[in-house]
Amino acid sequence: MALSTRIQAACLLLLLLASVASVSVLPHQTGQLTDLRAQDTAGAEAGLQPTLQLRRLRRRDTHFPICIFCCGCCKTPKCGLCCKT
């Protein structure tokens, strides 16, 4: 009986320590999010150049070469890669 009480007390202590640690980290992370949000709105207000937008699109497209809507243009059907794009 005493062992289970000790285990319960240890678990409660760990939960309390975890909650204190998460409360101390939360304001720091919230501050980082507000900084990022301010940078995003400043970039949107300034207006991005079209070349920067195209570079972002190209960079994203190169990471995902799989075609979602495969048109069957390859020799192997349903391979997932589109030869025309």
From Swiss-Prot:
GO BP of this protein: defense response to bacterium; intracellular iron ion homeostasis; negative regulation of iron ion transmembrane transport
4Fe-4S recorded as keyword: no
Subcellular location: Secreted
Pfam families the record matches: Hepcidin
Domain of life, source organism: Eukaryota
Stretch forming the signal peptide: 1-22
Keywords: Antibiotic, Antimicrobial, Cleavage on pair of basic residues, Disulfide bond, Hormone, Secreted, Signal
Disulfide bonds: C67-C83, C70-C73, C71-C79, C74-C82
Propeptide: 23-54
InterPro entries per UniProt: Hepcidin
GO MF annotation list: hormone activity
Primary location recorded for the protein, binned into one broad class: secreted
This protein's GO CC annotations: extracellular space
Primary role: Liver-produced hormone that constitutes the main circulating regulator of iron absorption and distribution across tissues. Acts by promoting endocytosis and degradation of ferroportin/SLC40A1, leading to the retention of iron in iron-exporting cells and decreased flow of iron into plasma. Controls the major flows of iron into plasma: absorption of dietary iron in the intestine, recycling of iron by macrophages, which phagocytose old erythrocytes and other cells, and mobilization of stored iron from hepatocytes. Has strong antimicrobial activity against E.coli ML35P N.cinerea and weaker against S.epidermidis, S.aureus and group b streptococcus bacteria. Active against the fungus C.albicans. No activity against P.aeruginosa.
Protein family per UniProt: Belongs to the hepcidin family.
Self-association state and partner proteins as the record states: Interacts with SLC40A1; this interaction promotes SLC40A1 rapid ubiquitination.
Protein name, as recorded: Hepcidin
Lineage: Eukaryota, Metazoa, Chordata, Craniata, Vertebrata
Name of the gene encoding the protein in the UniProt record: HAMP
